[in-house]
């Protein structure tokens, strides 16, 4: 198991090379809210459009503006610094008296909407994200690229966790191993080491990285076998747009029809204590994919940390996928994804896209 494994492509070999995020405007993300504001309560709900500022920075800025602790700021998800993004924040103001909103507006940040709500905005409380991505310096046959995009829209893609989950050069996986009391030797084997004690936020980040790495490893096996979007005996099914899981159950025409219309998807493990939800052939693939020493160490560490077995869909279908050639070497993509899904998974099925924002060391930011 490598910290930064090369993922297989489900739709075949790369059909382009390109550059992404040469400027922030090339990567635009708008949150799709999960609810309408109540219009009452003591949490000021702000919709903020920002450029070159990540979520944590804006949260700190809002806390300073409101004169409250950062724990009084809520947001649904993290947005990257190297982008133009729109997202909601909640600001806890018990007296319902807000400072001057115009003080927040500058060239790189604007409050585009504000209202009141009766509770703090919780993590994950969004319907999804809409992306407008501009790829520049595109090299590839336009007709072949168009065909690949149509295939992605029709069939979907593997639901990879993106490289943002794993830190620079995949270092979060090695850090998770260290947290669990292991160190990797030069020959790749693991040796015992003192467990690292970390802040809760750091611990949570590394637990997520460990889980994500194991999931990607199972998905790699399914893609390589050509059954990432096909039923296996013992499959645990995930309902589209939810965390609900059912099965295993005998294959039927009803399941076939639901799979074909993307109502259900095969699922893979988010590792933790407890029995795998799947069985038979599906479980055999998962156990085989996670039988190497590093995977076993991550599995044991996640179980000891108190996480429970959960599932994640193996298949992802970008919603409303559309594209336009702005010129012979510039391709613009528009699509929406559910929470927790990565635009880079879409780009990977097209080819090698160099992220200009992550090439230089000083460009590191939260994802």
From Swiss-Prot:
InterPro entries assigned to the protein according to its UniProt record, in alphabetical order? PsdUridine_synth_cat_dom_sf, PsdUridine_synth_TruD, PsdUridine_synth_TruD_CS, PsdUridine_synth_TruD_insert, TruD_catalytic, TruD_insert_sf, TruD_pseudoU_synthase
Reaction it catalyzes: uridine(13) in tRNA = pseudouridine(13) in tRNA
Q: Which UniProt keywords apply?
A: Isomerase, tRNA processing
UniProt-recorded Gene Ontology molecular function terms:
pseudouridine synthase activity; RNA binding; tRNA pseudouridine(13) synthase activity
Q: Name one GO biological process term.
A: pseudouridine synthesis
Q: Where is the TRUD domain?
A: 156-316
EC number assigned by the record: 5.4.99.27
Q: Which residues form a coiled coil?
A: none
Query: Which domain of life does the protein's organism represent?
Result: Bacteria
Which Gene Ontology cellular component terms are annotated? cytosol
Query: CDD domains in the record, alphabetically?
Result: PseudoU_synth_EcTruD
Q: Which PANTHER family match?
A: TRNA PSEUDOURIDINE SYNTHASE D
HAMAP family named in the record: TruD
| Primary role | Responsible for synthesis of pseudouridine from uracil-13 in transfer RNAs.
What this protein is called in its record is tRNA pseudouridine synthase D
The encoding gene is: truD
């Amino acid at each position: 198991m490598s910290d930064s494994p090369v993922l297989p492509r489900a739709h075949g070999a790369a059909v382009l090379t390109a550059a992404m995020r040469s400027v922030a405007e090339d990567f635009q993300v708008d949150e799709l809210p999960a609810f309408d504001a109540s219009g009452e309560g003591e949490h000021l709900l702000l919709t903020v459009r920002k450029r070159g500022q990540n979520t944590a920075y804006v949260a700190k800025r809002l806390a300073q503006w409101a004169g409250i602790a950062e724990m009084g700021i809520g947001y649904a998800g993290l947005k990257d610094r190297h982008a133009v993004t729109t997202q909601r924040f909640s600001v806890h103001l018990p007296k319902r008296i807000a400072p001057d909103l115009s003080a927040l507006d500058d060239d790189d940040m604007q409050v585009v909407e504000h209202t009141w709500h009766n509770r703090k905005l919780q993590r994950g409380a969004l319907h999804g994200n809409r992306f407008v991505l501009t790829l520049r310096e595109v090299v590839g046959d336009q007709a072949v690229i168009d065909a690949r995009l149509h295939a992605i829209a029709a069939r979907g893609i593997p639901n990879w966790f993106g490289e943002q989950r794993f830190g620079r050069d995949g270092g979060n996986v090695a850090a998770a191993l260290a947290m669990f009391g292991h160190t990797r030797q030069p020959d790749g084997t693991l040796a015992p080491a003192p467990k690292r004690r970390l802040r809760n936020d750091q611990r949570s980040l590394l637990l997520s990285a460990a889980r994500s790495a194991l999931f990607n490893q199972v998905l790699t096996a399914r893609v390589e076998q050509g059954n990432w979007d096909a039923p296996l005996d013992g499959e645990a099914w995930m309902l589209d747009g939810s965390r609900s899981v059912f099965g295993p159950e005998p294959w039927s025409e009803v399941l076939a029809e639901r799979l074909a219309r993307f109502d259900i998807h095969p699922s893979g493990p988010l590792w933790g204590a407890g029995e795998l939800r799947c069985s038979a052939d599906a479980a055999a693939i998962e156990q085989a994919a996670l039988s190497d020493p590093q995977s076993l160490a991550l599995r044991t560490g996640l179980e000891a940390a108190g996480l429970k077995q959960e599932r994640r869909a193996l298949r992802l279908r970008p919603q409303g996928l559309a594209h336009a050639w702005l010129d012979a070497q510039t391709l613009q993509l528009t699509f929406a994804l559910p929470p927790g899904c990565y635009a880079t998974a879409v780009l990977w099925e097209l080819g090698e896209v160099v992220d200009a924002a992550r090439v230089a060391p000083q460009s590191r930011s939260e994802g």
